[in-house]
Amino acid sequence: MQRRQSARAERVPAEGDWPVAPQQDVEVSEQRIWVDGCFDFAHHGHAGAMLQARQLGNELLVGVHSDEAILENKGPTVMRLDERVMAVEACRWATKAIPKAPYVTSLPWITHYGCQYVVHGDDITSDSDGKDCYRYVKAAGRFKVVKRTPGISTTDLVGRMLLCTKSHFIGSLEKRLSGDEGPGGESERIETGQAMLQRIKDYATDSTGLAPGCDVWYWHASRPAKLRRTTTSNTTQNERPGAARQDTTSSTNPVKEEKGKFHQLVQGKGVKPGQRVVYVDGGWDLFSSGHIEFLRLVTQAEETAAKAQGWFTEEAKKSRIEQTGEDYPPAFIVAGIHDDEVINHWKGINYPIMNVFERGLCTLQCKYVHAVIFGSPFSLSKAFLLTLPYSTPVAVYHGITKFMPLTYDPYAVPKALNIYREIANHEFQNVNAAEIVARIMKGRALYEERQRKKGEKGMGEEAERIRQELERKQRQKEIEGQFGL
């Protein structure tokens, strides 16, 4: 949430001009917390700040700065204001997003919305004059500090794109969590793994940030089962570094299906009586508006079906509360997350931009998700679906996608089982990792300047040459896949 602020005075809206309701001043409460920032292609660092802030009160209001203010004071945004607001509102710990919030945090703004305290990370942020962005709320004794999430920032993610690095990849998440894999000595690896597992547990909490929420699993299976090659002859020894390996052979002699083994990392609330278990999967790389809108539409589809069955009647709600002590939604959405190797196998270059741990945290913080399965297969097999921890899902949702240059359909099995459901195209259909990278590359000069201002190395000619070569190889692979070469 780092950002700079113009020193000019911020206008205090009159009644009727506030960006979102309420228009009348709200009574200030210590249980109502304010955070603010850019939240540009929101990552788990943003979510971590919101989680810690939410733990300090009962409501969390999140100010989101305008595109124009960010451009003037920090540099170009990757995501539009509406996309950034969507990301904030999808976070399970956010109560409400406040768009166009001022850069230098304003006492009249936080007071209007009834927030006693402003929360921010322990990093320093300043305006264009070098003054503290939180000077007014600090002077008023209305500022609280939380620990900044280490190892992740928007600047870091942009750097991965511009420099085309792969050093962030994780070979085996479970080995990383146990300390058996990763940089450093044994004690350092163990300490790092324990910290990572604790962060997963933290992000798996419910909307209060204090109680169990999401279930978290890891699926053990062989490498071919996760990649789901259709033949054993796909493995080659002479593949070029960075190029995507495509399934271009016939479907004879298929890889044997594996049910694998599910290991629970975090126990959450689990499936409640009457809930429909539905499954979604993907890379969830640079978790953004395209992913969020898809998950929202899945939730909406399930709620529409449940409404027709009387789920939302007062009598049904009362029965659920009497039985479990709380009300809950009609669908239990399980999100499968592919390993880094699986994504890079199919997309090439240096995808995924976020590693499996980072992508998992981004998925866990989303209020539409109730369980996460790390290490899910690229192509769904009958063995996998029939042995899910919650039994076979009643539906598998996916968007309208052209899986070229694949020679098979990764969703053939759920279609054969008649549980496949397709979400129609929507406004944010094309917003994914590739689109975000394209936005970055289109405005490369501006982003490089932003990086230099933050003390980061810009992308040089050699890095650009590497990216162009990797993209050329990827295009060649796609052509070969289309014609079965």
PLM feature segments, named:
Residues 1-485:
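Nucleotidyltransferase catalytic core that binds NTPs
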